[in-house]
Amino acid sequence: MPQLVLLFLVYFGAAKHLGMNLSGETAAVIVFTFWGTAEMGDLVRSALISIPKHQYDSGYGLGLNKWQVYLYIILPQTIRRLLPSAVNLLTRMIKTTSLVALIGVVEVLKVGKQIIDASRYTNPTAALWVYGAVFFMYFIICFPFSRLSRVLEKSLLINREMRINEWDSRF
């Protein structure tokens, strides 16, 4: 379900059907918490499903119990597969916060629109500069997460290759 629909359902639906008068910020926190949790759960599920069955069987064949198989075999592979999707979800959630302006929450885009409206006649190019600044703010927030993801992915890949080489050198 789209986030905007969820925002409207929680913000307006809670007031009408549950008799609760939620603030825009509270409704946004509720929606982003449930949406982010559901999305992350789906990502974890798909990462776990993507691990081939023979990985589990190999662990059991080595005499490991269920917890050891998950801890030593499945979890490291799942994290490697989950990391890019999780960072993508994080950046999507950051960028989707702009929708909360539609339920009255003051955030970056709403402030930008107010600045543009106030200076429309005195500075006709204000929209370009304000939206450029908003873009730059979102970029400054999201870009470090993407870089961190890249560093972590390389680190996990290097650690994996080192373990494989160490394993191969034993034989």
Where are these regions (language model features)?
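Transmembrane alpha-helices and adjacent helix-loop boundaries
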Residues: 1-171
